[in-house]
Amino acid sequence: MKKDKICLVSSSGGHLKEMLQLKRFYSKQDYYFVTLARMDGKSLAKNEKTYFVKCPARNPIKFIINIFQSLKILLKEKPTIIISTGADTALATCYLGKLLGKKIIYIESFCRPTKPSITGKMVYPIADLFIYQWKELAKYYPKGKFGGSIF
């Protein structure tokens, strides 16, 4: 049986920390990271296959750069699954991945107990599996799955 290739995409900081806490779920697969070239991302790159993209940060030029960087990585790596814990850094990878026929798994951040994140709201319509960690979010994500505290 062929292993899935997994793209793990997240912003740096807490989003990346949450992704790393999921390692038991992806460690036996072929995987790589897409994140920001900040201190934690650079540290990750010492031991893991890691690509860096521009942070869109509500800047149209940086977002366009992020789109091209994300597309280049997706075409090179050809993942079968994209898993994201947010935030804006992951948006282009998720949408481009969906257009390329990849499965999208989005995990809403644990720090969002009452209201959905902007990225969560944007990725929800295209996610094959959308996991939220607080029951209060069920009304925002009716097709999502309650995962409880998974980190």
Predicted regions span which residues?
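A short, glycine/small-residue-rich beta-strand->loop->alpha-helix junction that serves as a flexible
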Residues: 8-20
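Conserved nucleotide-sugar phosphate-binding/catalytic loop shared by glycosyltransferases and other
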Residues: 10-12, 28-66, 136, 147
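An amphipathic, basic-hydrophobic alpha-helix
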Residues: 58-80, 99
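An aromatic- and histidine-rich active-site surface loop
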Residues: 81-100
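Active-site-proximal region of nucleotide-activated glycan assembly enzymes
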Residues: 102-151
